[in-house]
Design a protein with these regions (language model features):
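Ligand-binding face of N-terminal immunoglobulin V-set domains in extracellular IgSF glycoproteins
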Residues: 40, 44, 61, 65, ...
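Aromatic- and carboxylate-lined catalytic core of secreted/periplasmic carbohydrate-active enzymes
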Residues: 53-55, 415-417, 431-581, 593-692, ...
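Active-site mouth of glycoside hydrolases
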Residues: 64, 124-126, 142-376, 380-388
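Residue-level recognition of secondary-structure-to-loop junctions
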Residues: 67, 99, 107-113, 550, ...
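Extracellular glycoside hydrolase catalytic/binding regions
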Residues: 297, 321-469, 659-661
């Protein structure tokens, strides 16, 4: 589990009240729109002058401003207004704010159709209701490149915009700021956008852009008194996201607020009776009527102020709600709370934003995932493994099968702590592999790394998003209704390594059948990380049993992880015979020889308490290439990603760049017979590389793969169907290789027309190191000299070329010192 460290923020807040000698019905004396014209799906805002009394303008039970909007087709939509204190950013370098005025009511609305809209504004308090005369504004047709509308879901595994285009989220978590929201988010999101990222996950947390917390804590003022500087930063953030084309999964509650055990903040919660709240225990947050009404008031404010925004992809009700106190005992209450709150958002959000929630994966509840108002599911995985992409893809496929809804990996990491991650994987290889594996494993978008501020930013790993986004843009995920398909790669023999993923107390699978192609039945995410002993915590014991056939004699290995309880002891049984029993410590490997033939292998712990397991390895039963394949509903389209699985952060750190995986044949059953074209894409640049014809016979695709130093993406399309044209790739050759630092290499390129060429040197992970303009080409075949920097360490590098319209695939070059 990730660790969370609170930080303070300044706070500005104003109570506003107009004293009146006698109670009279409130009135709106003026309504000033920000503009008389707004784009379809844009932000229409009107500012109100009112004559009314109130104590707390954020309490909808006390005073309410509302707008009723009638569209050009006669359809009627209603929205709440909201009270706000306005600010300006008075210092662009620090993000400091200066308040403007004393606060006022506003109404925001997003028109879903072009044409003339009529709106009526009202204000209501205990003294009555005042109505302002009807007004109008014009909604204009959209500029499609910048404004595709809101994000929607349908009966496919993917999301799309109002205008019909697919939306594939590519991004990361950026849950809170490190210093100042304006400064940090402007920096982070600019870099994300510059690399074609289009998504991040935001938390409404007390040390971030929260609205409500205990009176006197970090500038908060208690229930229904929302922190206005944070709300203003959120206003700015949504405007900035609209400018950059970035969409947010907005998490409205995090687990620590309702926990005394995991990242606990209950002691400072306004819901706690100690602080004057209605709940004596954390779990009453989900059942107490007063508590739920406070939550709904906050939701109402959120919807009123930000529900207009098309750049909110989804409301996330809770982060990892399984970490709240007594989760297993309170599952039914928590699910009922989700049902009520999801329905509340759906009923009061005129723009029908998507709704989801999240769990740490083994602590989830199918009842909640199956709720009709939960639009998509998500997984969170933190596993110390060189093959994290397998875990993410397994989780995605499991959730697609179990719940029949789109799903996304909302968080991933190599461990629950970011400490040391920069040394463990300085180039973000696990981020690259995890994003590609999770998307082509069936996710509605890429997996989302958790470590934005202490890893992606300081290591400048944003470049991993660009090629991912480029390839996602040419794959018809949504239009073809793609879904995961079985696939295997033969001809590249390797060991089979299985990585446990299930955490403490999980109901892990116990029976695993290893098939002849190296695939594993019950693979998914069902193998437990904890191997429990015979004396303590025995209620969790679920020792795994493997049914396997070795074609030749080999080995079976068990490697322990980095944590252990008291005096564990590894026991390995083969065909009912105990062949190994040894005391276990962390990071040890236990090996037994296995003869050719069919066997039943059981692993147990006869010691006192638990030990974590890092991996189980079966020699010679795997493939050196992993394939993640998606297939269209009509079985005439396919897309996928193939990975040389030796190219992972552990192997590259310990042994350098691995040898290319050669001789692989991809096999995918269940395709319609016919003539197809396979198109390959470079995963370091996103560039189209080349295409080749391929014939499907007997309902199975079989393709000889190119040599894989790292990975390739591909699309397979029916030759009889018109598909989007992809520009011809930009090809070049490079020599000499190997060479030495400081020398010049020659790039030979053939261009059909006059063009300006740019050459870039990349390191092994795709990070740009040095760029050089090659000048203007007059067309035809020519040679370009590229000067290598003199301080390069020895090793493998990549070169890429662009002509302003096209980007080439990469070519490798070896530098010796």
């Amino acid at each position: 589990m990730k660790k969370i460290y609170p930080t303070g923020l300044p706070f500005l807040f104003f109570f506003v009240s107009l004293s009146m000698t006698t109670a009279q019905a409130p009135s709106i004396t003026a309504a000033t729109p920000s503009s008389g014209t707004v784009e379809q799906w844009g932000k229409f805002e009107v500012q109100l002058d009112v004559n009314a009394t109130w104590v707390n303008p954020y309490d909808y039970d006390e005073i309410r401003v509302a707008g009723t909007f009638t569209g050009p087709d006669g359809a009627v939509k209603s929205v709440d207004g909201f009270f706000m204190q306005d600010y300006t950013v008075s210092n662009q370098q620090t993000g400091a704010l200066t308040n403007v005025g004393n606060g006022r009511f506003k109404v925001r609305f997003s028109p879903d159709k072009p044409g003339t809209w009529t709106y009526v504004l009202t204000i209501t308090n205990a003294a009555g209701t005042g109505t302002f005369a009807p007004q109008t504004f014009e909604a204009t047709a959209v500029s499609p490149d910048d404004n595709p509308g809101f994000v929607r879901t349908d009966q496919t595994n993917y999301l799309h915009f109002d205008d019909g285009r697919q939306y594939i989220p590519v991004g990361e978590n950026i849950a809170w700021q490190a210093t100042n929201p304006y400064v940090d988010y402007k920096n982070w999101l600019t870099k994300l956008s510059d690399n074609n990222g289009n998504f991040f996950r935001l938390w409404q947390c007390t040390w971030g852009l929260g609205l409500e917390w205990k009176n006197g804590s970090n500038g908060y003022l208690g229930f229904r008194k929302y922190k206005q500087n944070n709300a203003f930063y959120t206003d700015w953030l949504l405007d900035f996201c609209a400018e950059k084309g970035i969409y947010i999964m907005y998490c409205l509650q995090y687990h620590g607020q309702v926990s005394t055990n995991v990242n606990p903040n209950w002691s400072d919660s306004p819901f706690n009776t100690v602080n004057g709240g209605p709940c004596a225990n954390t779990w009453e947050f989900f059942t107490n009527a007063t508590a739920k009404n406070h939550t709904k008031n906050r939701y109402r404010y959120v919807l009123a102020r930000w529900g207009y925004s098309r750049n909110i992809m989804a409301w996330e009700l809770f982060n990892e709600v399984g970490w709240t106190d007594q989760f297993e005992q309170r599952k039914n209450d928590i699910s009922a709370w989700h049902e009520e709150m999801a329905a509340y958002l759906k009923a009061n959000d005129p723009n029908r934003h998507l709704v989801t929630t999240s769990y740490v994966n083994e602590y989830n509840d199918p009842n909640t995932w199956n709720l009709p108002d939960i639009d998509f599911t998500q997984t969170h995985f933190y596993v110390e493994t060189p093959f994290l992409e397998r875990t993410l893809a397994g989780g995605v496929r499991s959730y697609l099968n179990d719940y029949g809804k789109p799903t996304i990996n909302g968080e991933f990491g190599l461990s629950g702590s970011g400490a040391g991650l920069g040394a463990l994987d300085p180039d973000g290889i696990h981020i690259h592999n995890s994003m590609w594996g999770s998307l082509f494993g069936g996710g509605l978008g890429t997996g989302m790394s958790w470590w934005w501020d202490n890893y992606i930013e300081p290591k400048n790993l944003y470049y991993h998003f660009a090629p991912m986004s480029a390839v996602a843009g040419v794959v018809p995920f949504h239009a073809a209704n793609m879904a995961p398909a079985p696939a295997s790669v033969s001809g590249v023999p390797a060991d089979l390594l299985m990585t446990p993923t299930q955490g403490w107390g999980a109901l892990s699978d116990t029976s695993f059948i290893i098939n002849s192609d190296g695939s594993v039945t019950s693979a998914g995410a069902g193998l437990g990380q904890f191997l429990y002993g015979s004396e303590w915590n025995t209620q969790h014991r679920r020792p795994p049993i493997f049914y396997v056939s070795y074609p030749v004699s080999g080995q079976f290995k068990v490697r322990t992880g980095s944590d252990t309880g008291q005096s564990p002891k590894i026991v390995i049984w083969v065909d009912g015979i105990k062949v190994l029993e040894q005391n276990a410590a962390v990071n040890q490997t236990f090996t037994v020889n296995i003869s050719a033939g069919q066997h039943v292998i059981k692993v147990d712990n006869s010691g006192t308490d638990w030990v974590t397991i890092s991996s189980y390895t079966f020699s010679g039963l795997g493939s050196g290439v992993d394939a993640y394949v998606l297939k269209s509903e009509n079985q005439t389209r396919m897309a996928g990603w193939v990975l040389n699985n030796s190219y992972n952060h552990q192997s590259v750190q310990s042994g350098g760049v691995p040898a290319a995986a050669s001789g692989g044949t991809l096999q995918v059953p269940g395709m319609s017979n016919g003539a197809y074209t396979i198109k390959y894409f470079d995963c370091l640049t996103g560039a189209f590389l080349n295409s080749a014809p391929v014939e499907v016979a007997n309902g199975a695709l079989s393709v000889n793969l190119p040599d894989l130093l790292w990975d390739l993406a591909f699309v397979v399309e029916d030759q009889s169907v018109d598909v989007a044209e992809i520009p011809e790739p930009l090809h070049f050759e490079v020599f000499p290789s190997p060479t030495v630092p400081g020398s010049a290499v020659i790039l030979e390129v053939d261009t059909a027309e006059k063009t300006d060429l740019q050459v870039t040197l990349l390191d092994t992970s795709g990070r740009a190191l040095h760029s050089q303009s090659a000048g203007s080409s007059n067309g035809g075949r020519q040679q370009i000299s590229f000067q290598l920097p003199g301080d390069l360490p020895g090793g493998l590098y990549w070169l890429k070329m662009t002509d302003g319209k096209r980007t080439s695939g990469t070519k490798s070059i070896v530098i010796n010192r």
